């Protein structure tokens, strides 16, 4: 895959100015985390404000971890999200019930785990591969073993976990993902993006 066609999602957004800068850079999607245990959690009230002026063709992704069905429905009703991203132990039945395109995140340690997720979540728009961690649900800043990713997966996958301006070109050259998802690798502090790191990340991919 030509690196120039890699899709880019910047996740863990908490500020309007960071979202606008990401849009100016040409990213395809921005992620809002609706998970109280995350340092990047945003409330519905704040989310309404910071996504107020997002233009067409930039997707808003709601990132959730083992949410209640009613909470997911509330987000769909209140925020103009295009995609749901489930980061917990949600079943395929749970994810699909909202009639909304969804991404299923997994934290694989083996190729078999990746293939099993592709099979189980057959109706997901994509599978997101993130670093296994006992403490955090994403945003760890740690990479995982890219060698475990099977070749010729039948479903698009999104590469996440410890990506930054220094390793992103190696990652996409080695793994050929459909898209990449960056969070801590473009931050000054959790939830506060560093605009220089953001621009360098984009430049490393698109030139």
From Swiss-Prot:
Pfam families: PRAI
GO biological process, one term: L-tryptophan biosynthetic process
Alphabetized SUPFAM superfamilies for the sequence: Ribulose-phoshate binding barrel
Enzyme Commission number(s): 5.3.1.24
GO molecular function, one term: phosphoribosylanthranilate isomerase activity
Enzyme's top EC category: isomerase
Pathway: Amino-acid biosynthesis; L-tryptophan biosynthesis; L-tryptophan from chorismate: step 3/5
Keywords attached to this entry: Amino-acid biosynthesis, Aromatic amino acid biosynthesis, Isomerase, Tryptophan biosynthesis
Family, similarity comment: Belongs to the TrpF family.
Name of the protein described by the UniProt record: N-(5'-phosphoribosyl)anthranilate isomerase
Native source organism of the sequence: Legionella pneumophila subsp. pneumophila (strain Philadelphia 1 / ATCC 33152 / DSM 7513)
Taxonomic lineage from the root: Bacteria, Pseudomonadati, Pseudomonadota, Gammaproteobacteria, Legionellales
């Amino acid at each position: 895959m030509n690196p120039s066609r890699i899709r880019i999602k910047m996740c863990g957004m908490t500020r309007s100015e960071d979202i606008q800068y990401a849009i100016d850079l040409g990213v395809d999607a921005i992620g809002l985390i609706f998970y109280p245990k995350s340092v990047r959690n945003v409330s519905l009230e704040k989310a309404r404000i910071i996504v107020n002026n997002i233009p067409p063709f930039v997707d808003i992704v709601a990132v959730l971890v083992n949410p209640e069905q009613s909470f997911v429905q509330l987000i769909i009703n209140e925020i103009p999200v295009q995609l749901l991203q489930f980061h917990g132990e949600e079943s395929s039945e749970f994810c699909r019930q909202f009639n909304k395109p969804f991404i299923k995140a997994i934290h694989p340690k083996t190729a078999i785990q990746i293939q099993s997720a592709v099979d189980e979540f057959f109706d997901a728009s994509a599978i997101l591969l993130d670093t296994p961690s006992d403490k955090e649900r994403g945003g760890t800043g740690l990479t995982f073993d890219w060698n475990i990713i099977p070749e010729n997966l039948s479903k698009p996958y999104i590469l996440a976990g410890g990506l930054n301006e220094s390793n992103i070109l190696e990652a996409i050259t080695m793994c050929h993902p459909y898209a990449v998802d960056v969070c801590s690798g473009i931050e000054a502090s959790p939830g506060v993006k560093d605009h220089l790191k953001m621009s360098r990340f984009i430049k490393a991919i698109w030139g």
